[in-house]
């Protein structure tokens, strides 16, 4: 029964998640752009303590009131973390935003930092306290288990990652339109080849828009037919040649491959 309840709250069946009070403004701007404030209300900034300051390192998605979904490669056992929710500007303490300590991190047991191409780049962060849901802080939905998006499906990556290779980190949350690249194409030798696995999603590769350093762990947001946004991907890796590289789309952990793992972690922790 507990497991069934967890699945019912996490998976995109109920409209209690994935429907922002302030819907995102989806323009046709090429490249990234400032997101409408609070239009991705499950987006979090994962920050670590360093020399008395808190520094943004990765993104994440609030999927339960005390659980955040992020990438395994974002987590180091030697660091102390917190998450910031309900925020548009990282430098401003905004009304309605909250900062919560991370009490526990659970990294996928098959994740190997020396074998990024094997996938399983997924982690869950348990928060020290539950986050109250408001018009600025809402839960992200998970897609149904096994869901595979078709080629050219429109999604949006969000985060505070660099605007370009070796570029500046933005203060304002960014959004970028990415088209899904199906596995048959992305695994072609002239694209990512065997580096890409079926537990991943490719999106982008147009040489213009991509995720970049600082976006890691954040969501690939894709809208379902019922207008509900679902977190289909977790920003995992890009090309060593740089961000926005042609035929080297951003690679995401495919969330729909890990529904059972997510439910099990939450149930047992």
Curated annotation (Swiss-Prot):
The active site is at 73 (charge relay system), 121 (charge relay system), 216 (charge relay system). Residues 17-28 form a propeptide. It comes from the Eukaryota. It is an enzyme of class 3 (hydrolase). GO terms for molecular function: endopeptidase activity; serine-type endopeptidase activity. The keyword Transcription does not apply. Transmembrane segments: none annotated. Keywords: Disulfide bond, Hydrolase, Protease, Secreted, Serine protease, Signal, Zymogen. Elastase that enhances insulin signaling and might have a physiologic role in cellular glucose metabolism. Circulates in plasma and reduces platelet hyperactivation, triggers both insulin secretion and degradation, and increases insulin sensitivity. Interacts with CPA1. Interacts with SERPINA1. This is Chymotrypsin-like elastase family member 2A.
